[in-house]
Regions:
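N-terminal secretory signal peptides that target proteins for export/translocation
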Residues: 1-19
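Bacterial N-terminal signal peptides
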Residues: 24-35
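Extracytoplasmic cell-surface/polysaccharide-interacting catalytic and binding patches
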Residues: 39-112, 116-247, 258-274
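Conserved metal-phosphate-binding beta-hairpin within the catalytic cores
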Residues: 253
Length: 274
């Protein structure tokens, strides 16, 4: 399914000049998930921006660039620890951040646009039942055979449309995150008490990020009351600015007025200027 070989994510083919006028919209079906949009000045497809250029105060802990994620290694297509979003979604996330700044909080993002090649890697990994090395931390109570049925992994992801973001909140004075960092020693379950599990944020949201467990459901009554309040604070702020959540993940939100609702992209995540 992945046929992308160029830095900006487009597969290009040479054709005779006289044949170029016959290159119609029907030919684009062979490009799988990519639109015919031109590449913008930042090296991204038109309509996409780097979040740090729109809202530099938002913290970024891009988990799929490093190894601290549910697969345990860097993910295909993540060539830089950058959050890329559609222009509309980035503006809305910035508005959420500004909304909550008055309360001394800031937004921290874990994942934004996700290439389809990364989703394909998730699918392959989910079907490899021998690879269980990250189970103790990220899915301690769930069998890999149930990932698809329970909605934790899918053949397609809204992230690949560019208007979905995984995020949390933290105090504005919190120190910068170390991308992919995890303390040495035995892995602790993402469902463990707040003081014991990996500190995704100084605020308790009931589970760690990417925790595949019913406790991650936004409305789970089984998490502490403080976590429920923090989840509600995040969800209400996101909804005020045009996002909708996901029933399985408290950290996952999609901008409802997304500009590419039927297009899944595969350009790699690169740093500005690359």
């Amino acid at each position: 399914m992945i046929a992308i070989s160029y830095r900006n994510g487009y597969e290009r083919q040479r054709m005779p000049r006289q044949a170029s006028t016959a290159f119609t919209g029907a030919c684009l079906a062979g490009l799988l998930s990519l639109p015919s949009a031109a590449v913008g000045a930042a090296g991204l497809p038109d309509g996409f921006v780097y979040l740090r250029e729109v809202a530099p105060a938002i913290a970024q802990d891009m988990r799929y660039y490093g190894s601290h994620n549910f697969i345990g290694r860097p993910i295909d297509g993540y060539q830089a620890p950058e959050c890329i979003l559609t222009r509309e979604a980035a503006a809305a996330v910035k508005a959420v951040h500004e909304d909550l700044a008055a309360a001394g909080l800031r937004v921290k993002v874990f994942d934004c646009y996700r290439p389809t090649r990364a989703v394909a890697q998730f699918v392959r990994w989910s079907r490899d039942l021998e690879d269980q090395r990250m189970k103790a931390e990220f899915y301690p109570n769930i069998a890999k055979t149930d990932f698809f049925r329970l909605g934790y992994v899918a053949e397609r992801s809204g992230h690949s449309r560019g208007s979905t973001v995984d995020l949390t909140l933290e105090p504005a004075a919190a120190p910068p995150s170390q991308v992919g960092a995890r303390a040495e020693g035995p892995a602790v379950a993402c469902t463990a008490p707040f003081a014991e599990r990996f500190p995704d944020s100084p605020l308790d949201f009931g589970t760690g990020f990417d925790c595949m467990d019913p406790l991650s459901h936004p409305n789970s009554p089984a998490v502490p009351s403080e976590a429920r309040r923090n989840r509600a604070l995040l969800a209400q702020a996101m909804e005020r600015h045009g996002f909708r959540g996901l029933p399985e993940e408290w950290w996952h939100f999609t901008f409802k007025a997304e500009p590419f609702p039927d297009t899944w992209f595969d350009f790699p995540v690169t740093a500005p200027g690359e």
